Amino acid sequence: MRAFVLIKCEVDSVLSAVEEMEAIEDVIRVDAVTGKYDAVTEIDASDTDDLRNVVAGEIHSIDGVAETTTCIAT
């Protein structure tokens, strides 16, 4: 299951948050972006439980991550 996570970060924490997300096993790619969100992460999860663990357990535990929106690819 492939998903894209749109991430809002606290001021001055985008680059460090991106570096930490790059180390997450299921993360395929993460990019800092401009606009409404600060980063976009592509995830390859085995199922919805795995996706939930990556987003809620790993990404949300990173200092500076303020909010996420998850989009599941079909």
Regions found by a protein language model. Give the residues of each.
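A compositional/biophysical signature of low hydrophobicity enriched in polar/charged and small residues
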Residues: 1-74
